[in-house]
Amino acid sequence: MAPVRGDGMRGLAVFISDIRNCKSKEAEVKRINKELANIRSKFKGDKTLDGYQKKKYVCKLLFIFLLGHDIDFGHMEAVNLLSSNKYSEKQIGYLFISVLVNTNSDLIRLIIQSIKNDLQSRNPVHVNLALQCIANIGSRDMAESFSNEIPKLLVSGDTMDVVKQSAALCLLRLFRSSPDIIPGGEWTSRIIHLLNDQHMGVVTAATSLIDALVKRNPDEYKGCVNLAVSRLSRIVTASYTDLQDYTYYFVPAPWLSVKLLRLLQNYNPVTEEAGVRARLNETLETILNKAQEPPKSKKVQHSNAKNAVLFEAINLIIHSDSEPNLLVRACNQLGQFLSNRETNLRYLALESMCHLATSEFSHEEVKKHQEVVILSMKMEKDVSVRQMAVDLLYAMCDRGNAEEIVQEMLNYLETADYSIREEMVLKVAILAEKYATDYTWYVDVILNLIRIAGDYVSEEVWYRVIQIVINREEVQGYAAKTVFEALQAPACHENMVKVGGYILGEFGNLIAGDSRSAPLVQFKLLHSKYHLCSPMTRALLLSTYIKFINLFPEIRTNIQDVFRQHSNLRSADAELQQRASEYLQLSIVASTDVLATVLEEMPSFPERESSILAVLKKKKPGRVPENEIRESKSPAPLTSAAQNNALVNNSHSKLNNSNANTDLLGLSTPPSNNIGSGSNSNSTLIDVLGDMYGSNSNNNSSAVYNTKKFLFKNNGVLFENEMLQIGVKSEFRQNLGRLGLFYGNKTQVPLTNFNPVLQWSAEDALKLNVQMKVVEPTLEAGAQIQQLLTAECIEDYADAPTIEISFRYNGTQQKFSIKLPLSVNKFFEPTEMNAESFFARWKNLSGEQQRSQKVFKAAQPLDLPGARNKLMGFGMQLLDQVDPNPDNMVCAGIIHTQSQQVGCLMRLEPNKQAQMFRLTVRASKETVTREICDLLTDQF
């Protein structure tokens, strides 16, 4: 039977049918192998294949590849199809190349030449196929090879409209991967004037291209503003006939209108020319007027298109923020949407009003819709709409309506969705502090927050109320009385106990004159909560008790009894034992004057802006109005562990000597008019394995990079900045190691010329041999690639290899270096030993060249369980019940190298009183003792 000619390929259809009918994986593989053998024989046979046959077999290969099987032949036949004059054959050839051929192929020069031939063709179909192939591949090589031809096609008067459209989209694709390929100078004006093209497809594609170009170089393309305003005006004004044939459900050119409105939002102010600005305002008013007209169709497509243009026009009005009349009209229009039946419209209206609320011209107008927004918060079925209503209430809040909004949010908080409670708590806390005229109201609000949603009250919130109470003398007595009453509730959240314990410890004497809150009553009330709390809260309460001894000497005996109970083995927590023991001795030994000095009232905290704002912005960077986010110029806020330490260790009266970060969050200063840069708002992608870029190519000031932590673990995030995240997973066996580096592109554009290079000298390679596989030179937007490294320890070494990573981002060269987590301890093998064999070996390694010792200050308050956890991750065997002193930690292990095995013993002795460590390392090789000692010093 003669083969079927035309587009229908019977053989391909039969093959696909056979594959679908396979009952098992084995049957499928067998059928595929049979077909591959047949195709290979046809390609290698003496009989010349015609275009139809080549097309059919190439299609089969493409189908097999899409099933997940590797294809290692047929590439030349596909390239030959590019020379065909038949559309169907040329199309299949381009399809095969786009999918299977990579930029490193030996055939790439032939492919590029074939594409150039098609670009010069007079057949627009062939030109379009070539442009689509270039855009699909989109590599740097393609950009460099066709950087001259494509712009010429785009602006040439001889080019057909359909080709111009494809050329604009192709150039946009290449620009995203290689921003430097777009020519400047006279080309700029010619590209901009495409906005006047009469073909709908050309002007739409050109607008997308110009929008991308403007974002990169707004000054060079500023001439597009006048043309965009003029074109937009002609589209939306009925007296013109521009593109009136391109209507979508009675809306003229809605997609182009939206693109033009977005293009204009790249400039602020949009234009300085009075005539252009007047025409733009007239156009925006026309769009708002059309929104008030009765719908011309009941179909949803009409309303969708009409509202798309309207919302983008409102976004431009908000962006300009200079026309009070337009802002008020936009607000009124959005207010009508708040009661619309369509959920999406209500959501978009709330979102746009959040931005309008930040403008001085429309803030009061937004407030007129407060009752409707409150109703949306309570009654909406969709949680995302309720969330947006909360955001709008937060944005419209000021001194005039703060108490009402805060109360409504508190009322709703009791029944709010769990997914939005934490964010609501932060917003209520910020509003209560920012607009408090009476700080007793602020205290009431925060305590209500803890009572209603205690689990969602972060540490920053209750630290903040403590600081404000300490800094505001007029509210201290009220705060003490209020927390005392709150603690009398049968069920009391632990955060309430923390706040109550701290405030009563400082100001309990202000309410002690009332018999209902006598000293003993305060103590018993707090202690009744003690056994229900976590160790951290118990530690804070013990500090409160020692403060009580200074405030109320008459209950000294009661408190000392509690200290005695917890200074012995009845307390399983070593920190509580130590704290109780020290406080007991302090209360017994110290005189009244000494006790009063040590336990004096906490001093006022330095005034600064609250960082709860930064916490809120980090949680929802896109949901917080920018003018509400002001970055503090004060030192960094307190970390969780350090804050707790400052709270529970105040009895030592050494706050000023603690870490620079160990102070509570600062009191808010009067709000500034400057918009903070929000440097704390950049979210990190911490869980890659388990949203300002600097112009300097080496600017990594905001990078997260700490290789020290990898002394004790093998997996995690090695490096992170705004553009790139590098994760690592590693495994080691004896003297061999294998690392997987995961490079994640966090940007919206590809990183090109991506090149990690190992920095490791030939001399160093004699000790540690590291081999690294090559990675692809382009890291696509949002993508992740993996690079494998192997390491062989030949002999012990002191330093670790460095990897230098370079790439181009938006045309700017970026380069930085990081150390690989390949310290010598990675080649440890844990060794079990009993006490007798350990100390026998310890004694044998007593020579001067067999030991290294260092005494160093603890980097943080002594954390023995934490130190043990670190040592267990270091690679050696942590030996239990070997050292007579249970606080001491001893380890044993063998470092495997190619040349020898080096036994190593380690002893870490903590001194709790001095807050110091003594580290001793003994090994049969002097260099190993120094290397291990240097690695572990200052790590505890």
Swiss-Prot record:
Gene Ontology MF terms: clathrin adaptor activity
Biased composition (Low complexity): 668-679
Any one of the GO BP annotations: synaptic vesicle transport
Entry keyword set: Cell membrane, Coated pit, Endocytosis, Membrane, Phosphoprotein, Protein transport, Transport
Compartmental location: Cell membrane; Membrane, Coated pit
Positions bearing Phosphoserine: S632, S634
UniProt key word Membrane: yes
Main location: membrane
A Pfam family hit: Adaptin_N
Tissue: Expressed in the Garland cells, imaginal disks, adult midgut precursors, the antenno-maxillary complex, the endoderm, the fat bodies, and the visceral mesoderm and cells of the CNS and PNS including neuroblasts, the presumptive stomatogastric nervous system, and the lateral chordotonal sense organs.
GO CC annotation terms, alphabetical: AP-2 adaptor complex; clathrin-coated pit; plasma membrane; presynapse
Gene3D superfamilies the record matches: 2.60.40.1230, Leucine-rich Repeat Variant, TATA-Binding Protein
Topology class, membrane: Peripheral membrane protein
Extent of Polar residues compositional bias: 651-662
Domain of life: Eukaryota
Family annotation (InterPro entries): Adaptor_Complx_Large_Subunit, AP2_complex_asu, ARM-like, ARM-type_fold, Clathrin/coatomer_adapt-like_N, Clathrin_a-adaptin_app_sub_C, Clathrin_a/b/g-adaptin_app_Ig, Clathrin_app_Ig-like_sf
Residue ranges, annotated region (Disordered): 651-679
SUBUNIT field: Adaptor protein complex 2 (AP-2) is a heterotetramer composed of two large adaptins (alpha-type and beta-type subunits), a medium adaptin (mu-type subunit AP50) and a small adaptin (sigma-type subunit AP17).
Family: Belongs to the adaptor complexes large subunit family.
Function: Adaptins are components of the adapter complexes which link clathrin to receptors in coated vesicles. Clathrin-associated protein complexes are believed to interact with the cytoplasmic tails of membrane proteins, leading to their selection and concentration. AP-2alpha is a subunit of the plasma membrane adapter.
Descriptive protein name: AP-2 complex subunit alpha
Organism of origin: Drosophila melanogaster (Fruit fly)
Gene (name only): AP-2alpha
